[in-house]
Swiss-Prot record:
Subunit field text: Forms homodimers in trans (molecules expressed by two different cells). Forms promiscuous heterodimers in cis (at the plasma membrane of the same cell) with other protocadherins.
Residues spanning the membrane: 692-710
SUPFAM superfamilies with a match to the protein in the record: Cadherin-like
Domain notes: Cadherin 1 to cadherin 4 domains mediate homophilic trans-interaction, the interaction with an identical protocadherin expressed by a neighboring cell. This is a head-to-tail interaction, the cadherin 1 domain interacting with the cadherin 4 domain and the cadherin 2 domain interacting the cadherin 3 domain of the other protocadherin. The cadherin 6 domain mediates promiscuous interactions with protocadherins on the same cell membrane. Each cadherin domain binds three calcium ions.
Pfam family, one: Cadherin
Disulfide-bonded cysteines: C97-C103
Name the record gives this protein: Protocadherin beta-8
Membrane topology: Single-pass type I membrane protein
Species in which this protein is naturally found: Pan troglodytes
Family annotation (InterPro entries): Cadherin-like_dom, Cadherin-like_sf, Cadherin_C, Cadherin_CS, Cadherin_N, Protocadherin/Cadherin-CA
Length: 801
């Protein structure tokens, strides 16, 4: 059942409130009695249950009051608006109860929220609506003329369907000179007439008499019924038949077959001839006795004519008459007691059943039912049970009522329905069993939050994606059902307030699909993470969250950028190489970076063009330009090299670096073309600026150290020296060239030539070819050594190791 259906969870219900509408709660176990006269028209008022329960009209309607009875026979109806209990139909006491007095119809009143039930009964009061009826309208009685006064002759009784005072009260006979009638009472309470002789008969005077027998009931006014009695005066017959015993008591099982011998009665007559011949018959037998038993008129055997039913008649009182041919008769009584056998299985009557039931409500009433067995004694005793492996409890109440309720809170996610079998067994031998199967459905309560399939998700997106690209999905499931299991997704506020999540991704609230809202740039944003929430639609709603990491995959969208040598058309970089250089001499190193990552940033170098092919070579992995052979005089003094720098992307991107190499015999008087003007500082990207600043700082520190050293040496020498001015290009030189993509920093020792100009107050100098080792923390580890090799006057060189 769906949580949106607003099911009323009936928790901790009052299960055993046996109060029925009284003034106090104590001592209310006795059922409340109501009465109605039989034959009252349908829809007649019986009582007002709302007043009896002490409930206001609104409360009465809210409690959902119901009236149920055994077998769900609807003799009563309840007006929910007024609380009036009305007759559903006209009641006939004789049809409902027969001769049973009092005639009581039991019913139950059920209330909900909380659950209660009460016992009640409706007594149907008899009215005198039936007259006495003689089954035999004519009776023949033979009386011997020698019968003395006071002799009694039993007559057949009348039947009256009414009970109590409306039943037969007495019998009267029409006026005559010989007989009167006495009203006798049997052990079962029924009354029968007995004809008593008051005056001796004389057949010669009067051979027969015709009398009218009248049966009167006790109603007001009384009703009556009549029968004709023919009295035949017979000649003297000295002896009447006599039974061996006047009273017989026998027991017979209710499952005895038809024609079963119940008992054999026997009578004798001491007369001889036809006066001694005896015949047997039922005397004053009711319609039920006549249908149930038969008597062999010659042998006196009493046999069954139909099947017995203990539940309808527990005993029969049968009168047997033995009559001789002379008209004399004798009477005996046979009391037949029916023995109950276990021939009725228990019955289960369901009064209330609730399904589905909420999963989180313990002690919720599921069903109210009653059990019964038409048998008696041990055969009518009942035990009731359910399966042991179910979370339900069966409690006994009053009047063979049972309540089935939940023992513990249920979990719909573990089990959504239960098949409950109510087993009712009597204690007979063998016992009979009745099974009642019920399917109890468990309604859902929003007690499970959505659960993501993963605690965290990692999504990969290639940069330069198209906007609205589906980049992945998150998924959450909810073990509940219905609207409680409908999951909606949302983006939670990012923990990083600077992350513009709303402009980066969006999520489909229904299926959890994630979309990139704009094109991503790996160089600007390599990765970001955010949280995704999943909420159900229960009331109240439950939610959970998961972490989503988005990794931007690099695309080869950046060409290599050459850091050194600087590519400036107005001030080309010129490297000096002595002609005496050995093969493998390090000319310079091309340093380049790539804004991409991974293999897109793996750079390789190759010599694209050269003035003298085969003179120089470029190492593919580190960009070092070295001499490939010995230099000769035939080699041009000026060499132009074009180095191709290519990444490993697909497709690859590339850049070129142009190098100018000047072959010199020595470093004393190198020739370097002066630039026309110092190049303006271009707009560089941030990485280039950082590297240039770092290089400039290191170079300045080194120049200061060299100047200090030179100044000290100059002070110690007295003679002046004249040296040629060295012309070098202006501009920044990198002090610490690093391949940021894994090519490594320069690892060779660097040789610096310092040229000083004579006659200058400041004695400027420039280093021409820095070959610096790895510098950690901008400190020089090895000590400086001075080379005492002088050229053209005053000159010196420094070497850093």
């Amino acid at each position: 059942m769906e949580a949106s259906g607003k099911l009323i969870c009936r928790q901790r219900q009052v299960l055993f409130s046996f109060l029925l509408l009284g003034l106090s709660l104590a001592g209310a176990a006795e059922p409340r009695s109501y009465s109605v006269v039989e034959e009252t028209e349908g829809s007649s008022f019986v009582t007002n249950l709302a007043k009896d329960l002490g409930l206001e009209q609104r409360e009465f309607s809210r409690r959902g009051v119901r009236v149920v009875s055994r077998g769900n026979k609807l003799h009563l109806q309840l007006n929910q608006e007024t609380g009036d209990l009305l007759l559903n139909e006209k009641l006939d006491r004789e049809d409902l109860c027969g001769h049973t007095e009092p005639c009581v119809l039991r019913f139950q009143v059920l209330l909900e929220s909380p659950f209660e039930f009460f016992q009640a009964e409706l007594q149907v009061i008899d009215i005198n609506d039936h007259s006495p009826v003689f089954l035999d309208k004519q009776m023949l009685v033979k009386v011997s003329e020698s019968s003395p006064p006071g002799t009694a002759f039993p007559l057949k009784n009348a039947e009256d369907l009414d009970v109590g005072q409306n039943n037969i009260e007495n019998y009267i006979i029409s006026p005559n000179s010989y007989f009167r009638v006495l009203t006798r009472k049997r052990s079962d309470g029924r009354k029968y007439p007995e004809l008593v002789l008051d005056k001796a008969l004389d057949r010669e005077e009067e051979a027969e008499l015709r009398l009218t027998l009248t049966a009167l009931d006790g109603g007001s006014p009384p009703r009556s019924g009549t029968a004709q009695v023919y009295i035949e005066v017979v000649d003297v017959n000295d002896n009447a038949p006599e039974f061996e015993q006047p009273f017989y008591r026998v027991q017979i099982s209710e499952d005895s077959p038809i024609s079963f011998l119940v008992v054999k009665v026997s009578a004798t007559d001491v007369d001889t001839g036809v006066n001694g011949e005896i015949s047997y018959s039922l005397f004053q037998a009711s319609d039920e006795i006549s249908k149930t038993f038969k008597v062999d008129f010659l042998t006196g055997e009493i046999r069954l004519k139909k099947q017995l039913d203990f539940e309808k008649f527990q005993s029969y009182e049968v009168n047997i008459e033995a009559r001789d041919a002379g008209g004399f008769s004798g009477k005996c009584t046979v009391l037949i007691q029916v023995i109950d056998v276990n021939d009725h299985a228990p019955e289960v009557t369901m009064s209330a059943f609730t399904s589905p039931i909420p999963e989180n409500a313990p002690e919720t009433v599921v069903a109210l039912f009653s059990v019964s067995d038409l048998d008696s004694g041990e055969n009518g005793k009942i035990s009731c049970s359910i399966q042991e492996d179910l979370p339900f409890l069966l409690k006994s109440s009053v009047g063979n009522f049972y309540t089935l309720l939940t023992e513990t809170p249920l979990d719909r996610e573990s089990r959504a329905e239960y098949n409950v079998t109510i087993t009712v067994t009597d204690l007979g031998t063998p016992g009979l069993t009745t099974h009642l199967n019920m399917t109890v459905l468990v309604s859902d309560v929003n007690d499970n939050a959505p659960a993501f399939t993963q605690a965290s998700y990692t999504l990969f997106v290639r940069e330069n994606n198209s906007p609205a690209l589906h980049i992945g999905s998150v998924s959450a499931t909810d073990r509940d059902s219905g609207t409680n299991a409908q999951v909606t997704y949302s983006l939670l506020p990012p923990q990083n307030p600077h992350l513009p999540l709303a402009s980066l991704v969006s999520i489909n609230t229904d299926n959890g699909h994630l979309f990139a809202l704009r094109s991503l740039d790996y160089e600007a944003l390599q990765a970001f993470e955010f949280r995704v929430g999943a909420s159900d639609r229960g009331s109240p709603a439950l939610s959970s969250e998961a972490l989503v990491r988005v990794l931007v995959l690099d695309a080869n969208d950046n060409s290599p950028f050459v850091l050194y040598p600087l590519q400036n058309s107005s001030a080309p970089c010129t490297e000096l190489v002595p002609r005496a250089a050995e093969p493998g001499y390090l000319v310079t190193k091309v340093v380049a970076v790539d804004g991409d990552s991974g293999q897109n940033a793996w750079l390789s170098y190759q010599l694209l063009k050269a003035t003298e092919p085969g003179l120089f070579g470029v190492w593919a992995h580190n960009g070092e330009v070295r001499t490939a052979r010995l230099l000769s005089e035939r080699d041009a003094a000026k060499q132009r090299l074009v180095v191709l720098v290519k990444d490993n992307g697909e497709p690859p991107c590339s850049a070129t670096a142009t190098l100018h190499v000047l072959l010199v015999d020595g470093f004393s008087q190198p020739y370097l073309p002066l630039p026309e003007a110092a190049p303006a500082q271009g707009q560089a990207d941030s990485l280039t600026v950082y590297l240039v600043v770092a290089l400039a700082s290191v170079s300045s520190l080194f120049l200061f150290s060299v100047l200090l050293f030179v100044a000290v040496r100059l002070c110690r020498r007295s003679r002046a020296a004249s040296v040629g001015r060295c012309s070098v290009p202006e501009g920044p030189f990198p002090g610490h060239l690093v391949d940021v993509r894994g090519t490594g920093s320069l690892s060779q020792n660097y040789q610096y030539e310092v040229c000083l100009a004579g006659g200058s107050g400041t004695n400027e100098f420039q280093f021409l070819k820095p070959v610096l080792p790895n510098i950690q923390g901008h400190s020089f580890g090895p000590e400086m050594e001075q080379n005492s090799n002088f050229r053209n006057g005053f000159g010196f060189s420094l070497q850093l190791k």
